[in-house]
Amino acid sequence: MRIEKCWFCSSNIYQGHGTIYVRNDAKVFRFCRPKCRKLFARRVNPRKVKWTKISRKMANKELCNDAILTFEHRLNEPRMYDRAEAERTLSSIPRILEIRKRREDFFIKDRILTGQEMNKESDLKYIERHANLLEEEVAGEKQVAKAKKREAQTN
């Protein structure tokens, strides 16, 4: 069974699903849902729509340029059937999926950690810029503490 890709959002299109638009120059466009077809008809650029795969890759929210992703590429040239090669391929699929999952998880975790580091840096810069506010607050707390000590000594 051949699984096609949506021209607009790059999601999977299984057999019996989606629509096909063939232009006058015989260029074929496959769409997974009417939303993608309508955006294509309005000539919306998929890179500027936040939920498409290409825009997520451009914003570094998805893993790209990784060797593990080359296994998914579609080959347009017919190959001679070899039973041994087919068995090796089928037996290696779980291992490939495991490696891919591990790399994607690491990519997401790394992205989150770098975001947290950037937030910490911006918070520290904010504190440095507004240090006078903290000094006023600390001074007020010291005065309150001194007043409590005086009351305790007089009692």
From Swiss-Prot:
Residues passing through the membrane, by range: none
Gene3D superfamilies: Ribosomal protein L24e
SMART domains from the UniProt entry: TRASH (SM00746)
Organism superkingdom: Eukaryota
GO annotation (BP), single: ribosomal large subunit biogenesis
An example Gene Ontology CC term for this record: nucleolus
GO molecular function: structural constituent of ribosome
Family of this protein: Belongs to the eukaryotic ribosomal protein eL24 family.
Record's protein name: Probable ribosome biogenesis protein RLP24
